[in-house]
C-alpha cells in the first residue's frame, strides 16, 4: 500500500513540476522575443556594451525562466530518487520563488501605484506588459494565483514524499526500512552448514597377528 501511494505521489510531483517547467520555458521564449525586438530597434543585442541603460525587464524574465527550468530538473530528480537532500533542496528553491513571486503579485494587485516601485525600463517591454495586465486584470490575477498554488502544491507533495521515504529496494537510510523476511533469507543463504570438529570415525583395522590367525585357520580348512 505504501509503495502504491509513493508511486502516485511521485507521478503527481512530476506532473506539477512539469507545469512549473512550462511556465519557465514560456518566460524564456518571451524574453527571447523581447531580445529580438530590442535588436531590431537598437541594432545590437542588449547584452552588448552600449550607452543605453540596462534592460532589466528582459534580464529578469530570462533569468527567472532559466531558474524555473533548473528547479524543474531538480524536482524531477527528487521525485524519481525520493532522496531527502534533493527534496529539501527542491522545497527550498520553491519556497524562495513563491515568496518573491507572492510579494510581486501582492504589490501589483494591492497597490494602485505599483508601477512606481519598479525602475524605468529602456526597452519599453515593461510598459507593454503593464498595459496587458491592466487590460486583462482578471485573467492575469487568476494566472498568478494558479502559479503560486501550483508551487505550493509541489512543496506539499515533496513533504509527503519525504515522510514516506525512498523505496526499500533502492535505499536503506535506517535499519527500520529493512524487510525482516528478506534479511532472514539472506542470513540463511550466507550462513555455512554446521559441522562438528572431531576425530574421524572409522572401523577398527585388523592387526598383523589377527590376519595371520585368519590365514592359518583358512589353510587348515
Curated annotation (Swiss-Prot):
Family: Belongs to the tetraspanin (TM4SF) family.
PTM annotation (Phosphoserine): residues: 174
Keyword field contains Cell wall biogenesis/degradation: no
Subunit structure, interactors included: Homodimer. Constituent of tobamovirus replication complex.
Keywords: Membrane, Phosphoprotein, Transmembrane, Transmembrane helix, Vacuole
Broad class of the protein's primary localization: membrane
Organism domain of life: Eukaryota
Transmembrane intervals: 15-35, 54-74, 89-109, 141-161
The protein's name in its UniProt record: Tetraspanin-19
Protein topology in the membrane: Multi-pass membrane protein
Gene Ontology cellular component list: vacuolar membrane
Subcellular location per the Swiss-Prot or TrEMBL entry: Membrane; Vacuole membrane
Inactivation phenotype: Slightly reduced efficiency of intracellular multiplication of tobamoviruses (e.g. crucifer strain TMV-Cg), characterized by a reduced amplification of TMV-related RNAs.
Extracellular side: 36-53, 110-140
InterPro entries according to UniProt: Tetraspanin/Peripherin
Expressing tissues: Expressed in rosette leaves.
Topological domains annotated Cytoplasmic: 1-14, 75-88, 162-221
Stated role: May be involved in the regulation of cell differentiation.
Amino acid at each position: 500500500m505504501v509503495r502504491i501511494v509513493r508511486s502516485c505521489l511521485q507521478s503527481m510531483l512530476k506532473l506539477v513540476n512539469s507545469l512549473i517547467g512550462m511556465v519557465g520555458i514560456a518566460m524564456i521564449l518571451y524574453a527571447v522575443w523581447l531580445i529580438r525586438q530590442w535588436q531590431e530597434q537598437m541594432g545590437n543585442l542588449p547584452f552588448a556594451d552600449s550607452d543605453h541603460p540596462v534592460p532589466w525587464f528582459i534580464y529578469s524574465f530570462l533569468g527567472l525562466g532559466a531558474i524555473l527550468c533548473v528547479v524543474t530538473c531538480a524536482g524531477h530528480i527528487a521525485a524519481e530518487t525520493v532522496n531527502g537532500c534533493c527534496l529539501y533542496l527542491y522545497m527550498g528553491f520553491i519556497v524562495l520563488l513563491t515568496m518573491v513571486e507572492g510579494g510581486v503579485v501582492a504589490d501589483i494587485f494591492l497597490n494602485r501605484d505599483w508601477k512606481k516601485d519598479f525602475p524605468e525600463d529602456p526597452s519599453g517591454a515593461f510598459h507593454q506588459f503593464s498595459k496587458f495586465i491592466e487590460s486583462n486584470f482578471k485573467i492575469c490575477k487568476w494566472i498568478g494565483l494558479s502559479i503560486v498554488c501550483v508551487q505550493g502544491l509541489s512543496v506539499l507533495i515533496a513533504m509527503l514524499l519525504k515522510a514516506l521515504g525512498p523505496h526499500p529496494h533502492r535505499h536503506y537510510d535506517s535499519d527500520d526500512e529493512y524487510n525482516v523476511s528478506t534479511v532472514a533469507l539472506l542470513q540463511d543463504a550466507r550462513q555455512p552448514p554446521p559441522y562438528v570438529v572431531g576425530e574421524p570415525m572409522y572401523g577398527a583395522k585388523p592387526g598383523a597377528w589377527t590376519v595371520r590367525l585368519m590365514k592359518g585357520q583358512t589353510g587348515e580348512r
